């Protein structure tokens, strides 16, 4: 009985560890087959005979992103949806460009920890813990900062020049929950009475905020 109990504990511990990040690959590669209708916590593998170097290559992060938008920033993702060779490998990247004063608004990555490296500029960055503690710092060219998995975080260009970072994730598809857009531009919309109660503001204020995120006609 003791041996069985120990074995059960080992199995449970292993299962818990396995779910802490993307599952380990069980083969050398599993290039995503975008044409397959089968989706089991990832993409199906395309035949090994059809795999080429292009499946593992991308120039997505070469060009600066257009930052002439509401927040003054643009995230260019290099994840499994853009690079099929990342399937099952548990990593991805992104380039984030910021106009002067630009903001990557408060958001979370439900499936990954993020680490950023500043290519150009200076940024105010931070994350908020589950006890509502703000952990923040100003980072400059050549410096790095880590945002723990699932915690709300942000980056803001505090300078007069454009800024750029490269971000790394321990997931092939980290996912992004943009807090302002999630709450005020969801489809179907979050009920006004939920937002008025949550933010202790009136319906007119909620409608005004929603109008700022509505698609431009």
UniProtKB/Swiss-Prot annotation:
Keyword Signal: yes
Main location: secreted
Modifications the protein undergoes after translation, according to the UniProt entry: Glycosylated.
GO CC term, one of those recorded: apoplast
Compartment(s): Secreted, Extracellular space, Apoplast; Secreted, Cell wall
Recorded superkingdom: Eukaryota
Domain Cupin type-1: 58-207
Keyword terms of this UniProt record: Apoplast, Cell wall, Disulfide bond, Glycoprotein, Manganese, Metal-binding, Receptor, Secreted, Signal
Glycosylation-annotated residues: 50, 68
Gene3D superfamilies: Jelly Rolls
GO molecular function: manganese ion binding
SMART domains, per the entry: Cupin_1 (SM00835)
InterPro entries per record: Cupin_1, Germin, Germin_Mn-BS, RmlC-like_jellyroll, RmlC_Cupin_sf
Disulphides: 30-45
Pfam families named in the record: Cupin_1 (PF00190)
Role, per record: Putative receptor for bacterial rhicadhesin, an attachment protein of rhizobiaceae.
Similarity comment text for this entry: Belongs to the germin family.
The protein, known as: Rhicadhesin receptor
């Amino acid at each position: 009985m003791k041996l069985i109990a120990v074995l059960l504990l080992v199995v449970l511990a292993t299962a818990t560890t396995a779910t802490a990040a993307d599952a380990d690959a069980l083969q050398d590669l599993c290039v995503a087959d975008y044409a397959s209708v089968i989706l089991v916590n990832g993409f199906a593998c395309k035949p090994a005979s059809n795999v080429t170097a292009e499946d593992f290559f991308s120039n997505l992060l070469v060009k600066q992103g257009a930052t002439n938008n509401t927040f003054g920033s643009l995230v260019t993702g290099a994840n499994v949806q853009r690079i099929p060779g990342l399937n099952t490998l548990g990593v991805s990247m992104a380039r984030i460009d910021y106009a002067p004063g630009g903001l990557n608004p408060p958001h979370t990555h439900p499936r990954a920890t993020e680490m950023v490296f500043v290519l150009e500029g200076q940024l105010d960055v931070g994350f908020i813990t589950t006890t509502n503690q703000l952990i923040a710092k100003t980072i400059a060219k050549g410096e790095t900062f880590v945002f723990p998995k699932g915690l709300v975080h942000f980056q803001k260009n505090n300078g007069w020049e454009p800024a750029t970072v490269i971000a790394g994730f321990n997931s092939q598809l980290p996912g992004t929950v943009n807090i302002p857009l999630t709450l005020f531009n969801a489809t179907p919309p979050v009920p006004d009475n939920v937002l008025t109660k949550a933010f202790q503001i009136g319906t007119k204020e909620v409608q005004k905020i929603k109008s700022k995120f509505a698609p431009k006609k």
